[in-house]
Amino acid sequence: MITIRAARVEDAPGIAKVHVDSWRTSYAGIVPAAFLENLSYQRRTNLWDDILRDAEREHIVYVAENEEQEIVGFVGGGRDREHNPPYEAELYTIYILQEYQGQGIGRRLVRVFAEQLLRSGMRSMLLWVFAQNPSRRFYESLGGRYIKSAQFEIGGATLEEVAYGWEDVSVLVQD
């Protein structure tokens, strides 16, 4: 059974492991291999420790735990970082270990994230995803509407990201 709960500071190492492992499996063939090999559990742990300790950042983070209380997925976000009206919030990151994908965990994480946005007074959100990432279909299945695309550089390669948006996140919390 998978449990979804708010993240705590002590979750930083578990979140970091899911973050790094998910990048390595999900983005193989998309992001340069050297970049993926250089990802560090310790650097990601430090990053997540800082995020989870910084209350002023208003970062919303939830984790998915298995029966052994190991973190197998997480979602994080907050206010839209690039101010893309009419979107108030941004889902910055959602990752689930490959062996746990396809079990509805992603939908549950998005739902709890959207519920927290609504409690915080934010009714709309967007997210960015690599154009080559097959998970785009997941966001489309949740009703995400294509907004725009942008190019950026990572590990010496130019990649394309696409933004999906929800003008009313309440659709994500309905049964």
Where are the model-predicted features located?
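Extreme N-terminal starter segment of soluble prokaryotic enzymes
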Residues: M1-T3
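Acetyl-CoA-dependent GNAT
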Residues: A6-E10, K17-I30, A34-E99, V110-V112, ...
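Generic detector of contiguous secondary-structure segments
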Residues: L52-I60, M122-A131
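Short polybasic/polar patches that bind polyanions
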Residues: Q101, L118, E140
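Short coil/turn segments at alpha/beta junctions that flank glycine-rich nucleotide-binding fingerprints
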Residues: Q103, S120-R123
